[in-house]
């Protein structure tokens, strides 16, 4: 056994291909065949001696060296193997998943061994002081008679349960009778009652000492219990919350410790639909992408937004499969169970919008091949046609063949208790990014205290509104644009009323139109022809206008405040819709706090231009209605220059909201949608530690944010400051913003609980 494991772990004697079996197992199988036995345990001592000789010969053949006989050589070989393991593929992947810095390195423990394989009076196992899946205060674990610890961990043999209760539960799941269980699969409490009682007592003692759930490894050598190690056990999000609250109620830890025990990201697990665990074990993985938006989704494949809508109207569940998404796909995304994209990263359009909707999304699945013309997608060696069933796991990035049943997670009182604790200790408010009353209500249910970003452009794609938007874009003069905008005014006003009502007195930051106009016009000839017929103009005129709107670099082009400056009637319409909606809701007895945000400002002149239009429009509405309400005018800080001249911009702006998605793009010079092509390589080769679109780059982008806050407040000490990029829901970024003294962070609705806990932790750690 020693030669086999040393040869594998230290000398690297592993199968060379996936089809090849372990070289040592091949030798064992041959010897068993020669001896006419089925199980390893049936081999005699002489047979094992023969195996040792054969193993050593294999080592010499594979490595060209004799197996080391010196204990010191063996020890140093083992130590070096542990150090080398830091850079193996699995370790690198684990670090990437858990954001562990590569430079940390690993440690080596050297300790004397005890043996669990000295006969039927010896055993080995793993135990937990509480249930790591549910958090229940139930001691549990598994053991093997006459075995070593690796056998339990590696699953070489099927282990038995430590407690009688656990053993009976396991037998019930396996369909095994109580009589058969007791005879063939007894618990440790039944087979070695003295050692089991001692183990349970030690587990309680260790938990009392560490004040947390313990994961323990033990060996029983010839009837004597030896504890090998203990550590705070890994647990699910649900178990994390329950264990912390149970320990708090028991007086073992205080409120601050309970909050600090939270891993904010794990709260995600509690909020989205999940797959049935038993069904998941049988599911076939056909592709893997980025876990862009958590949750579980099952549906029929569709490739276009209008098809998704049509199928959904017939009560069909669909998964929208796209090469990449654009705002025009919003309708389809809204009705889909989940979204799968071939391109795009964790902060791509699909990912950001899906998180905002609480939709499951797998993005950047680069190995799939989408053919829009044939309406097929190739995954895992199979071609899926429109209507075929697939399932997505937005928490892992896995794509499954067929239907995998999902279940709704149950939020219990412990979740609410943790949220109440977060509210008690936090100094930084958490708002939400929400574009519809439904999103706003969902975020309020999670404890959001306002809206930090309401994107008005998403409203333009609903129903017949897109027609009015396109009329406005294609209009040949100001009067034509105003006529089209007049159709949009009541629609926008209605949207804003719904959002103000849902927020019920909390602040609402509404961003004026941001994307370039070419995103709103049709690019397919058939759709262009329909638009031309509706407007009474020629197809050539439509094509000419669409072509004129095309830009080489739209991200840095005619968008944001630049649109409002060149087409002031757009800003006028949106400002009027906001103010009229606020007055209407105020009339119903609801307190309203509108904050009008001008996007992409980079200079004082730009914000002066737009603020003048907003203030003039508001004054007109107040005069028309004979009443007024307070409102704020501010800007998004997303252009690096805005941070550099924040002291000037604050002369006009009454609040700053840092749009860190675009600020990161412009500071790094990375395209958010194209960067995934090389960022993975950058991370693997140590160029960057984390994806700057997922975790705020505090050394670079963060310095611009800090500069913007300080300069802005130097001009206007009462300047309200927040962040509304996707970083607003990432724990380390939230803590950074809290340290800068920001008033709030804003994130998608399903990230609100994560941000609330992270903000509370920042206040406690301060």
Labelled PLM ranges:
Residues 109, 302, 319-321, 340, ...:
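Structural motif
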Residues 1-283, 310, 316-319, 326-331, ...:
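Nucleotide/phosphate-binding sheet-loop regions of phosphoryl- and nucleotidyl-transfer enzymes
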Residues 223, 375, 395-397, 662:
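Beta-strand-connecting loop/turn residues
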Residues 338-341, 429-431:
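General secondary-structure propensity
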Residues 224-226, 319, 323-334, 338-340, ...:
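Glycine-rich phosphate/ribose-binding loops and adjacent secondary-structure elements
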Residues 97, 259-311, 316-318, 324, ...:
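Long, charged amphipathic helices and adjacent flexible linkers at domain junctions
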Residues 305-308, 325-327, 347, 377-378, ...:
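A generic local structural motif
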Residues 411-413, 421-766:
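Conserved alpha/beta-domain cores
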């Amino acid at each position: 056994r020693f030669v086999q494991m040393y040869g594998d772990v230290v000398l690297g004697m592993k199968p060379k291909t996936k089809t090849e079996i372990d070289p040592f197992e091949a030798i064992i199988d041959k010897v068993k065949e020669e001896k006419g036995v089925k199980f390893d345990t049936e081999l005699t001592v002489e047979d094992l001696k023969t195996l040792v000789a054969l193993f050593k010969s294999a080592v010499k053949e594979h490595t060209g060296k004799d197996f080391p006989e010196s204990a010191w050589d063996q020890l140093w070989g083992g130590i070096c193997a542990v150090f080398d393991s830091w850079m193996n593929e699995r370790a690198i992947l684990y670090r990437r998943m858990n954001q562990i810095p590569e430079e940390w390195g690993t440690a080596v423990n050297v300790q004397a061994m005890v043996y669990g394989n000295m006969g039927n009076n010896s055993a080995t196992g793993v135990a937990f002081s509480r249930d790591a899946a549910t958090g229940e205060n139930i001691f549990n674990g598994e053991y093997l008679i006459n075995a070593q610890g690796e056998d339990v961990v590696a699953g070489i043999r099927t282990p038995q349960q430590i407690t009688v209760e656990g053993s009976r539960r396991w037998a019930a799941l396996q369909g095994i009778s109580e009589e058969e269980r007791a005879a063939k699969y007894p618990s440790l409490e039944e087979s070695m009652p003295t050692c089991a009682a001692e183990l349970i007592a030690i587990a309680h003692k260790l938990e009392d000492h560490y004040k947390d759930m313990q994961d323990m490894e033990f060996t029983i050598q010839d009837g004597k219990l030896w504890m090998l190690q203990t550590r705070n056990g890994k647990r699910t999000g649900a178990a994390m919350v329950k264990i912390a609250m149970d320990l708090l109620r028991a007086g073992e830890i205080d409120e601050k410790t309970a909050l600090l025990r939270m891993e904010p990201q794990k709260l995600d697990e509690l909020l989205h639909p999940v797959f049935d665990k038993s069904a998941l074990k049988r599911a076939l993985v056909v592709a893997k992408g980025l876990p862009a938006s958590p949750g579980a989704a099952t549906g029929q494949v569709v490739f276009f937004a209008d098809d998704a809508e049509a199928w959904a109207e017939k009560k069909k569940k669909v998964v929208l499969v796209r090469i990449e998404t654009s705002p025009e796909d919003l309708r389809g995304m809204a009705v889909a169970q989940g979204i799968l994209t071939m391109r795009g990263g964790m902060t791509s359009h699909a990912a950001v919008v899906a998180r905002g909707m609480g939709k499951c999304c797998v993005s950047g699945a680069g190995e799939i091949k989408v053919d829009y013309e044939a309406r097929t997608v190739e995954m895992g060696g199979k071609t899926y046609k429109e209507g075929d069933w697939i399932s997505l796991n937005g928490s892992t990035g896995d794509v499954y063949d067929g239907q995998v049943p999902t279940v709704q997670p149950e939020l219990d009182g412990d979740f609410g208790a943790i949220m109440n604790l977060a509210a008690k200790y936090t100094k930084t408010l958490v708002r939400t990014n929400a574009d519809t009353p439904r999103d706003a209500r969902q975020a309020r249910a999670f404890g959001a205290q306002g809206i930090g970003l309401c994107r008005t452009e998403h409203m333009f794609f609903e129903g017949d509104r897109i027609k009015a938007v396109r009329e406005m874009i294609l209009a040949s003069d100001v009067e034509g644009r105003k006529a089209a905008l007049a159709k949009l005014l009541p629609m926008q006003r209605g949207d804003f009323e719904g959002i103000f009502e849902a927020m019920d007195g909390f602040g609402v930051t509404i961003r004026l139109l941001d994307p370039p106009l070419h995103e709103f016009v049709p690019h397919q000839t058939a759709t262009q022809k329909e638009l031309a017929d509706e407007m009474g103009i020629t197809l050539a005129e439509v094509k000419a206008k669409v072509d004129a709107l095309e830009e080489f670099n739209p991200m840095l082009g005619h968008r944001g405040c630049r649109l409002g400056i060149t087409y002031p009637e757009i800003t006028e319409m949106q400002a009027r819709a906001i103010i009229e909606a606020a007055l209407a809701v105020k009339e119903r007895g609801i307190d309203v706090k509108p904050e009008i945000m001008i996007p992409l400002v980079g200079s004082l002149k730009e914000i002066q231009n737009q603020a003048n239009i907003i203030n003039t429009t508001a004054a007109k509405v107040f005069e028309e209605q004979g009443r007024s309400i307070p409102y704020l005018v501010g800007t998004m800080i997303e252009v690096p220059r805005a941070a550099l001249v924040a002291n000037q911009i604050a002369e006009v702006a009454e609040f700053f909201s840092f749009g860190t998605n675009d600020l990161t793009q412009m500071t790094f010079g990375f395209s958010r949608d194209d960067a995934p092509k090389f960022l993975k390589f950058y991370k693997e080769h140590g160029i960057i530690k984390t994806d700057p679109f997922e975790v705020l780059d505090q050394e670079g982008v963060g310095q611009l944010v800090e500069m913007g806050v300080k300069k802005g407040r130097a001009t206007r000490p009462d300047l309200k400051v927040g962040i509304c990029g996707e970083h607003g829901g990432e724990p380390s970024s939230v803590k950074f913003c809290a340290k800068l003294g920001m008033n709030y962070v804003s994130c998608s609705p399903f990230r609100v609980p994560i941000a609330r806990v992270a903000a509370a932790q920042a206040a406690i750690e301060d």
